[in-house]
């Protein structure tokens, strides 16, 4: 430990030295402590043992108390909500072995490997792509074309830089790669469509035989055109309509070219077409072309989302690869300040509106003090919000609304005075003044605030002054004077006939004023107005206001244009149709007019021609409009742009263009936008290499290339599409063509119709769906619980048909051959054994028709495969297996005296009698099948059979139950492929008094199964048979023969004659045929379980009880419960007689109670059964019931 002396002991220099030494020691000691702590921490981390997560030496043994079942039940969890079940001693009962709730899993659907595209491709052409060398090769075009093959591309290029060339090249190569797919070029207007047809056919050389033009929605052979062509030029509205009507398959479209893509906003048809195609396929390419994508980031992102754009290619006029290909374009600005006359008018207007502005300020509507700063758009926005506000009272709301409307009108007047001049202001203000004055005088308006404004002294003075100035001033605004000076200089320097000028302005009144001013110059200037199709807005009719229209009053006839009205004045009033627009443009190109004064109609898309000078009379805050205007010049030769500014126009223009350039730069870098994922159509193994070659233009395209008229281009292209039938002036007669039915297209790999959830899930560990299991359960339920024989027969037929379809052809041929042999042998025996009665048939009847045999296969039921029976088994066990034939047991079919047993797959038994021949009074032979009831088969002597006699129609009769002691043997063919010398035989009894043909219209006796008998609990005795023996009894009941069954089991109730009801339903058939009973007494044929109504009997014997649970209990899934009768539930003990009686109870589920009895019979009471005698008939099973 270091001890420092106090500073007071030291003096002078020693004291200073001590001070510094003490500080040094302090810092050294401090850093030493830090270093020591770091080293210690690292040592602890490196030497500390890591405790494994899985520690075998834990305290889990505490939870493994196996002696406490209640504690174990808590740990394992109890699914039941109630308390644990306990025994009489108080301990917790054992957990039931009944399976818990089934767990289900989703059936895995195999994932289909998606190929790059579903379109058919030409892989040989896919190795290369053609780049036309007909024009100059430009780097930016080359790069954009290659990029368009792999991405949905948005191309933003300045006007005149070859966007159409890029589209044509991409279309040409997609046509080579996807020869049967469709390529669609969409443009918003007909003139643009015509321009693109001319460009694509003259650049890429696409044959006209593959090109179609669709501009008419009413054309009736649209489906034929869509199916026969590959390249289509059309408008988006036409494509949207054809997609919605099912005329064109959306999955067949491989390329979609969109011109003027900046329109893809809102609910425009471009967006609807892309949305519709996306519903069916994403394997198609989009090429979007525009000069100005949007003025802000949100607009660009909206286009990207609507058109699924995955890549953006943007070039500006300052781009490196663009500059050297741009023509020199000089942009000149000129600011024109308002004249003194305009300033005087502005002051008078401000003096008149000041009281209204003060009222608006008091109400909090506007926060302005200078009336000259009133803005039209601002006032309209505030008024819209006020109307939409439900909290403002109605009176105050509409009062504020009219104030803002008046202020907005004044703001528009300011704009017209500052930008367009006095004449434009006069036209607008006079119309508003006349409208209000007329309504005020007619007492239709009570707005005192507006009256105070319009009838005030400043406004009256203003109107008089404007009227005077419009007559004396040569130019209404200094801009017009600057424009005239520019035109003078231009035409002096460009005296050639090819010089062209376009002047852009926003309002029609201003355009007409400019035209009139130019016309007054009387020189070589030839101007004309160029506006849209809509008519001039209908002005307020002062004369007819308030007058009622007379009934039947016709519209006024069109006023003929007076000779003093010029073409531009008439166009300004009536609008310009497309025909007139094309005529003006055609004359402009030819030099008839060399100046066009255009509104916004001339800004976008139109190829007006070579323009040397562009004058922007006004400017807007939209950079897109400004760029479109300036792009009309400098395409093929140098040009000049003159921007005329007034008031605050220049600042707005600079702000808009500066923001647009900023956005363009960030879009080029990929900032601020989120692109969609890429989807390749070309396989990854292919990367097409460029092949630069000169494109040979087909002869049919030369005519399109030489044509300049848009209508003529459309007509020529249409005539080629129709095979030369579409001549000018002729219309095809399509009246006989019917409207095609609408086609509904589905996406790839879609499943139509409804699909249940059960078909898509399965139990864990199962290989079949829940629906398939339910279907099997439903079939078993119908087989067990059905009261109608027809339902069982129908199910048997369906199962037989499914089994027959699954067999191979070789096995079926073998079965048919065996059936042929059997039928021939039966026919031969029948013919040869008749009792002296001739039954002649043609000789060719021995050959069975293959079609009839094949048809009869549907009516054949298959008996489950019997197994070989061991001779070592006891007689009773053999009888038990033969008698109680279930799917789990076997049948011994012996073959005559040889007593040989064979294992066969199935036995074919005809269950359907298709013979509906009418019967006579006599009856023929009857064939009856008798089960083998003993290991020893008695062979009866043969007896000739009498010829079959037809039955009577519709009369029920008793069946003669006295059998013939003699019978013949008929072989039943086996379905196995192995052939054997021995035949599996059945004993057949021929009865001369009966026939095997059923009578038409008479219900045949139906055998009743054990389940039906136990469910009904009828008082009269009934026969209970197994499922396998049921098919034999059904055949026996159809033949309606009877034969006493030999006693094979010592049963005290087996000798009872059984009455089988021929008519299972409870109708009143006996009332119709009263002379004949509806039932027949038939000796029982191999009964299994029988009940009697004797008082001393009421339950099964011990042997029958044992056989019931051995042969009829089948372990099935707990969810597939089958209604089953539990005999124990119905037992009751009589105290006097000390005997058990059988009660009449309903069906219960195949549950644990049945399982308990089954286990009891097999395992639990083996010791007690062993103590008894080995004679099964004398064994006592009542102790099971007692427990």
Curated annotation (Swiss-Prot):
The gene is MPH1. Residues 144-311 form the Helicase ATP-binding domain. InterPro entries: FANCM/Mph1-like_ID, FANCM_DEXDc, Helicase/UvrB_N, Helicase_ATP-bd, Helicase_C-like, P-loop_NTPase. Residues 781-817, 980-989 have a biased composition (Basic and acidic residues). Interacts with the MHF histone-fold complex to form the FANCM-MHF complex. SUPFAM superfamilies: P-loop containing nucleoside triphosphate hydrolases (SSF52540). This is ATP-dependent DNA helicase MPH1. The lineage of its organism: Eukaryota, Fungi, Dikarya, Ascomycota, Saccharomycotina. ATP-dependent DNA helicase involved in DNA damage repair by homologous recombination and in genome maintenance. Capable of unwinding D-loops. Plays a role in limiting crossover recombinants during mitotic DNA double-strand break (DSB) repair. Component of a FANCM-MHF complex which promotes gene conversion at blocked replication forks, probably by reversal of the stalled fork.
């Amino acid at each position: 430990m270091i001890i420092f002396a106090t500073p007071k002991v030291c003096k002078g220099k020693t004291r200073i030295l001590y001070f510094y030494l003490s500080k040094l020691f302090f810092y050294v000691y401090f850093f030493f402590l830090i270093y020591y702590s770091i080293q210690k921490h690292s040592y602890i981390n490196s030497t500390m043992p890591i405790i494994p997560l899985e520690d075998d030496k834990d305290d889990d043994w505490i939870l493994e108390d196996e002696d406490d079942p209640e504690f174990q039940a808590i740990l394992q969890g109890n699914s039941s909500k109630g308390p644990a079940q306990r025994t009489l001693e108080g301990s917790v009962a054992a957990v039931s072995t009944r399976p818990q709730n089934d767990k289900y899993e989703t059936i895995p659907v195999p994932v289909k490997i998606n190929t790059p595209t579903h379109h058919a491709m030409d892989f040989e052409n896919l190795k290369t792509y053609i780049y036309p060398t007909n024009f100059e090769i430009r780097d930016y075009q080359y790069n954009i074309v290659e990029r368009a093959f792999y991405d949905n591309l948005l191309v933003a290029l300045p006007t005149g830089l070859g966007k159409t060339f890029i589209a044509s090249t991409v279309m040409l190569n997609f046509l080579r790669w996807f020869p049967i797919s469709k390529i669609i070029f969409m443009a918003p207007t007909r003139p643009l469509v015509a321009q693109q047809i001319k460009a694509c056919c003259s650049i890429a050389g696409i044959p006209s035989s593959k090109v179609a033009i669709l501009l008419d929605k009413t054309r009736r052979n649209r489906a034929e055109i869509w199916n026969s062509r590959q390249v289509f030029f059309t408008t988006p509205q036409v494509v949207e309509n054809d997609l919605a009507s099912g005329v064109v398959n959306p999955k067949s479209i491989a390329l979609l070219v969109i011109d003027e893509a900046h329109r893809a906003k809102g609910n425009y048809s471009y967006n609807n077409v892309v949305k519709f195609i996306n519903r069916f396929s994403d394997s198609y390419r989009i090429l979007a072309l525009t000069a100005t994508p949007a003025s802000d980031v949100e607009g660009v992102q909206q286009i990207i989302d609507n058109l699924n754009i995955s890549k953006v290619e943007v070039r500006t006029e300052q781009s490196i690869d663009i500059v050297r290909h741009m023509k020199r374009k000089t942009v000149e600005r000129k600011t024109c300040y308002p004249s003194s006359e305009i300033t005087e008018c502005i002051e008078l207007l401000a003096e008149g509106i000041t009281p209204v502005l003060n009222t608006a300020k008091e109400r909090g509507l506007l926060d302005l003090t200078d009336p000259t700063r009133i803005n039209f758009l601002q006032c309209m926005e505030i008024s819209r919000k006020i109307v939409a506000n439900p909290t403002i009272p109605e009176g105050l709301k509409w009062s504020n609304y009219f104030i803002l409307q008046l202020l907005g009108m004044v703001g528009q007047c300011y704009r017209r005075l500052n930008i367009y001049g006095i004449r434009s202001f006069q036209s607008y203000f006079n119309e508003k003044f006349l409208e209000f004055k007329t309504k005020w005088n007619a007492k239709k308006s009570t707005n005192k605030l507006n009256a105070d404004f319009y009838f005030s002294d400043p406004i009256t003075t203003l109107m008089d002054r404007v009227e005077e100035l419009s007559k004396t001033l040569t130019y209404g605004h200094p801009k017009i004077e600057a424009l005239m000076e520019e035109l003078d200089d231009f035409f002096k320097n460009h005296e050639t006939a090819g010089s062209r000028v376009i002047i852009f302005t926003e309002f029609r009144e201003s355009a007409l004023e400019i035209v009139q001013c130019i016309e007054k110059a009387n020189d070589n200037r030839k101007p004309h107005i160029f506006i849209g199709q809509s008519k001039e807005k209908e002005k307020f009719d002062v004369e007819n206001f308030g007058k009622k229209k007379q009934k039947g009053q016709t519209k006024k006839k069109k006023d003929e244009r007076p000779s003093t009205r010029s073409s531009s004045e008439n166009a300004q009033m009536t609008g310009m149709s497309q025909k007139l627009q094309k005529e003006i443009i055609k004359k402009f190109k030819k030099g008839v007019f060399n100046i066009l004064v255009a509104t916004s109609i001339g800004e976008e898309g139109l190829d007006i021609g070579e323009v040397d000078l562009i004058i922007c009379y006004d400017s807007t805050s939209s950079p897109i409009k400004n760029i479109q205007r300036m792009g009309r010049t400098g395409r093929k030769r140098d040009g000049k742009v003159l921007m005329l500014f007034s008031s605050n126009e220049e600042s707005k223009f600079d702000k808009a263009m500066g923001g647009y350039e900023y956005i363009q730069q960030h879009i080029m870098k990929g900032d601020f936008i989120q692109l969609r994922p890429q989807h390749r159509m070309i396989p990854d193994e292919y990367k097409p290499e460029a092949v630069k070659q000169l494109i040979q233009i087909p002869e049919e395209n030369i005519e399109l290339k030489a044509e300049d008229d848009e209508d003529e281009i459309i007509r020529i292209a249409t005539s080629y599409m129709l095979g030369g039938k579409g001549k000018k002036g002729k219309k095809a007669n399509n009246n006989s063509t019917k409207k095609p039915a609408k086609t509904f297209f589905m996406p790839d790999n879609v499943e139509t119709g409804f699909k249940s959830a059960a078909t898509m899930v399965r139990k864990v560990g199962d290989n079949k769906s829940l629906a398939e299991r339910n279907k099997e359960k439903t079939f078993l339920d119908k087989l067990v619980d059905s009261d109608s024989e027809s339902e069982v027969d129908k199910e048997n037929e369906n199962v037989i048909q499914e089994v027959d379809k699954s067999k191979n052809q070789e096995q079926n041929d073998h079965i048919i051959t065996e059936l042929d042999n059997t039928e021939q042998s039966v026919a031969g025996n029948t013919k040869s054994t008749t009792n002296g009665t001739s039954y002649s048939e043609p000789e060719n009847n021995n050959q069975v028709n293959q079609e009839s045999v094949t048809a009869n296969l549907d009516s054949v039921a298959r008996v489950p495969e019997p197994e070989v029976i061991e001779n070592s088994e006891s007689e009773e066990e053999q009888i038990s297996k033969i008698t109680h034939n279930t799917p789990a047991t076997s049948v011994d079919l012996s073959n005559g005296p040889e007593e040989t047993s064979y294992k066969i797959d199935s036995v074919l038994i005809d269950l359907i009698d298709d013979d509906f021949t009418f019967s006579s009074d006599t009856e023929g032979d009857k064939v009856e099948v008798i089960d083998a009831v003993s290991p020893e088969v008695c062979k009866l002597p043969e007896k000739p059979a009498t010829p079959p006699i037809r039955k009577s129609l519709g009369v029920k009769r008793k069946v003669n139950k006295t059998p013939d002691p003699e019978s013949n043997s008929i072989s039943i063919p086996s379905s196995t492929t192995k052939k054997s010398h021995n035949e599996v035989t059945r004993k057949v009894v021929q009865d001369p008094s009966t026939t095997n043909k059923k009578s038409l219209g008479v219900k045949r006796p139906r055998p009743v199964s054990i389940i039906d008998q136990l469910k009904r609990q009828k008082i009269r005795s009934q026969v209970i048979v197994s499922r396998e023996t049921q098919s034999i009894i059904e055949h026996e009941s159809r033949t309606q023969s009877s034969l006493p069954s030999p006693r094979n089991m010592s049963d005290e109730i087996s000798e009872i004659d059984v009455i089988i009801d021929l008519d299972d339903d409870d109708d009143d058939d006996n009332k119709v045929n009263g002379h004949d009973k509806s039932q027949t007494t038939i000796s029982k044929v191999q009964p299994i379980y029988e009940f009697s109504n004797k008082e001393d009997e009421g339950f099964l014997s011990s042997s029958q009880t044992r056989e019931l649970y051995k042969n009829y209990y089948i372990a099935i899934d707990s969810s597939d419960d089958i209604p089953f009768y539990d005999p124990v539930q119905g037992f009751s003990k009589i105290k006097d007689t000390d005997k058990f009686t059988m009660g009449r109870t309903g069906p219960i589920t195949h549950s644990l109670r049945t399982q308990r009895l089954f286990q009891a019979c097999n395992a639990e009471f083996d010791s007690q059964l062993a103590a008894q005698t080995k004679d099964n008939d004398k064994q006592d099973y009542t102790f099971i019931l007692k427990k």
